[in-house]
Amino acid sequence: MYNTEKFDKDTFVPQCFESDGEFELRGQKIKYHTVSEDNVFYDDNGKAIASIFSYSYFRTDVENSENRPVMFCYNGGPGSSSMYVHAGFFGVKRLKYEEEIDRPTSLPPYQTIDNPDSLLDICDLVMIDPVGTGYGVLIDQSRGKDFYGIEEDAESILTFIEKWTHKYNRWLSPKYLCGESYGCTRTAVVAGMAGGGSGNNRGYGVKFDGLVMIGNTVTTGKYFFHPIPVEEAVVWFPTYAAINWFHNHPTDQSVDEFAMEAKKFADEEYLVALYKGESLQGEAREAIKKKISYYTGVSDKFLEDRALRIDDAGFRHEVIKHLGKSVSRYDGRHTRDQLVPYQDEERKGDWFDATGNRYDGFFYGALNGVILPSLNVKMDRQYLTFNLFDDETEDYGHPKWNINAKGGTTADRLRQAMVSTHGMRTFFANGWYDDCTDIGLVYYVCDHAGLPKDRVYIKPYKSGHMIYISEDNCKELSEDIRKFIEGKDPTK
C-alpha cells in the first residue's frame, strides 16, 4: 500500500477540534459539545508512534455529567474506520434513508438529517477510528506490529478508553461498548482484558456495564472464518430461509415465524440427516430434501450434488437462479445479474458482491461533506475509510488475527468478561438477511460458550449486515439499545 501523506514521529502535531450544537430529540432541545481529537501513543523516548482518532459527543444541558452513561462505538474489518456507525446511526447528524433496499445509492447528492433516533439524551457517545483507519494514523511505520492483531488492536482500544475516562473524569459513568462486525470480536477481547484486570502490557481499572454486538463475529472457532465443530449448514440455515422467504415467498408467515420454524427443522431434522449421510435413502431422503427445498429455495439437483449440505456461495448463486440473479452476502435482499460461475464470483470476493461497496460513496460523501464540518473538523489529513494493512496481517488466518495464538477463542474472552464482571450484559443484534455474520452463529455461540443466559439478549432484525439501514430499522435498533442502557430487556 502507498500513502498520500507522511507523518514524522519527531514533528507530529496532534489535532483537536471542538464544536457546540443544539438539536431537537424526542420533543426536547438537546444542547451538546463535541471534541474530535488525536489520542497519541508514544514510545519510550517520548516520540509519537500512532494515534487513535475519536469523536466525542457530550450532552451539556444536564446537571451532573460525571455519572451519565457513555458508549464507545466502532466498526470492524479489521481495518474499518467508524464511518458507518458514525454517519449511519450514532451521529447527531446521520444519513437519511429513503427506500429500505434501493437507497442509499452510491451517487450524489447525499442527504443528511438531524438524527431523530439519537441516544444522546440518555448517553454520551464516542466514535473511534482505530490506528491506521479514518483519521487514526500509524506515525512510525515500523510499529504496526504493536497495533495490528486481535490482541494488539484490543489493547490499544482499551488503553484509549481508560485514558479518555481519566481525561474527562468519567470513572463513575456506566460504560458500554458497541461494535459492528469485526468490532464484535474487538468488543469481546477488550471486555475480556478489562474483566481480567490486565492486557498483555499493563493492568487496567476500567469496567464495562454492557456490550452491544451488531452483526456478530464472536465464535467458538479459532477465528471468525475458521470452522466450528458442527455442521455449519445447520447453523446458517435460518439465514438461508429468511433470504428465500424474501425473494420466493413460500409462505404467508412473517419472516420471523418462517426463519425460526426453519431453525427448529435444522436443529431437529436437518442435522440428523447430514449425520446419516449416504445411509439416509428412499422416502426418508426425499422427505428431507423436500423440506430443505421448501425452507431454502434450492433445487433437488443442488442438494444431491452437495450430499444435502448447503454451502454459502452456492446458496447465494442458487436461490434465485431462475431469475438469472445472485444475492448478496452482506444483505441477501440485494441482487445482481449472474455474470460468471459462482466459483469465479467467490474469488472476486466483496468487490463482486451485490451489496459490495454500493453504500461507501454515500457514507463517505455525507461524512466528509456534512457531518465532519458540523463538528468543526478541518483536517488536511486524508480520511481512510478502510485500511487493508498488508496481505499478511489482514489475513484472518495469520497468527496476528488468530485468538488461538494467545489461547482460547473470542467466545472464551466474552465468557471471561461476563463471568468476571458481575452484572455485565450483552445484547446481540443481527439481521435476518446477513449471510456474512449469520444470526445462526449467535444462537450457536450462546448455547455453547458458557455465557450467563440471564444476561444475554438476542434479537433478529429485518435487515442485512448493517442493520440500521432504513429509517424503520434505525428507529427500532435505537429504541432497543435505549432499553438496554436503561437496564431493560431490549428484545421486549
Model-based region annotation:
Residues Y2-T4, G46-D146:
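N-terminal cap/lid subdomain of alpha/beta-hydrolase-fold enzymes
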Residues R94-K96, A191, G195-T296:
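A catalytic-pocket lid/entrance helix-loop region that shapes and gates access to the active site
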Residues L120-C123, P130, F147-H166:
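Alpha/beta-hydrolase active-site loop
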Residues R170-Y182:
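Alpha/beta-hydrolase fold nucleophile elbow
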Residues G179-G192:
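Glycine-rich nucleophile elbow surrounding the catalytic serine of serine-hydrolase chemistry
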Residues Q281-C436:
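Alpha/beta-hydrolase fold catalytic core
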Residues M424, D438-H448:
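Short alpha-helix in the alpha/beta-hydrolase fold that links the catalytic acid
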Residues G464-N473:
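Catalytic histidine-centered segment of alpha/beta-hydrolase-like enzymes
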